[in-house]
Amino acid sequence: YIDPHYGVIVEDGGEVLPDGVTDNHQATKYQKRVTELKNLEASNRLFIELVEELHRRGMKIILDGVFNHCGSFNKWMDRERIYENQKDYQPGAYISPDSPYRSYFHFLKDDEEEWPYNPNYDGWWGHDTLPKLNYEDSVKLENYILYIGRKWVSPPFNVDGWRLDVAADLGQTNDYNHSFWKKFREAVKDANPNALILAEHYGDPSEWLQGDEWDTVMNYDAFMEPVTWFLTGMEKHSDEHMEDL
């Protein structure tokens, strides 16, 4: 679904966090907004209207597909405990060992006594706010992401393609990575042959650009890096600060 904060809030309720409180488990207003089905469905309808208007004006729209990892607030993990007490949602993998999403993640400590609230999972680059998705151990997860790839480029949404976040990092091995993107391309192009598959990638992307995976890549090496250096005198990811700029 489209986040209602960017879409439509039909039903509101709950309370904002008090000053000084950072526990999202108490963010009842946020919880009400993002778990209420009426808000989610209304937001999707608004998105359909947005895409129709963009196309009427001769414009295209692509979505950012973050399929290597999710956020700690995602209902699959629910480390922020947003969905824990919502009656229409199953427990996240952080909450319960019986979560239907447990296999979506690799838990470094997976004995039953580590739950509830098991923080010992693989995060992308070690970030616990970015739980890495565990495709190799979950056919269900793979099939769901392929479904997502098809869904948004198909009617009634009719998005014009995908931008794939850290696409080369997906999966645990290079072999699986290529296998997945071939399946993803087949799913997307079957739904919408004109959909663009644009990957975020640093370095040589040639092994993914053989006609059966990505269409193209974001041109970091030949555009963003030199332009950043020209404008700032620093590499794009530098933490340095130049006082004369």
Language-model segment annotations:
Residues 1-245:
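Active-site and adjacent substrate-binding regions of carbohydrate-active enzymes
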